Curated annotation (Swiss-Prot):
Keywords: Cytoplasm, Ribosome biogenesis
Lineage: Bacteria, Bacillati, Cyanobacteriota, Cyanophyceae, Oscillatoriophycideae
PANTHER family from the UniProt entry: RIBOSOME MATURATION FACTOR RIMP
Protein's name in the database: Ribosome maturation factor RimP
Domain of life: Bacteria
Gene3D superfamilies linked: Ribosome maturation factor RimP, C-terminal domain, RimP-like superfamily, N-terminal
């Protein structure tokens, strides 16, 4: 379940991050930790996301969060790169990782399989397209529960 502050945080973070030429990939608020952890994953579409990218976003976002006071009490702000085990959600993700190996989970099973692996060829409103050992496979979006970059 998404924390109710996530949309507000995304609205605050997105213009800051985009001004630096970066993308917001995901925002997670871990309230089960003490103090709670607000993690913002960013990506540099032009090159590898650097420590400097994370530091710049951290400073700028921290100032705005403190100024707006939308965060309840003490919290830890973490800015990071999503890494290789990340899930693909947005159209931008599917474009950026075309040709990469992905794992797709389906429920209910599609063609008697719950797990699919192959090279991502694309996505449209109907299906995610994979290349599995030279064979093209279209997995309907309606049965897909997650698409994740393969290890």
């Amino acid at each position: 379940m998404t924390h109710p502050l996530i949309p507000q945080i995304i609205d605050l973070a997105t213009p800051i991050v985009e001004e630096m030429g970066l993308d917001v990939v995901e925002v997670v608020f871990q309230t089960n930790k003490r103090p709670p952890v607000l993690r913002v994953d960013i990506r540099n579409p032009a090159s590898d996301t650097s420590l400097n990218d994370c530091e710049q976003v951290s400073r700028a976002l921290e100032a705005v969060l403190d100024e707006t006071a939308i965060m309840p009490g003490a919290y830890v702000l973490e800015i990071s790169s999503p890494g290789i085990s990340r899930y693909l959600n947005s159209e931008r993700d599917f474009i950026a990782f075309k040709g990469f190996e992905v794992n797709i989970a389906t429920n209910p099973p599609y063609k008697d399989k719950k797990e699919w692996r192959g090279r991502l060829q694309g996505r449209d409103e109907k299906a995610v397209y994979l290349n599995r050992k030279g064979r093209a496979i279209a997995i309907p979006c309606a049965v897909i529960t997650k698409v994740q970059l393969a290890d």
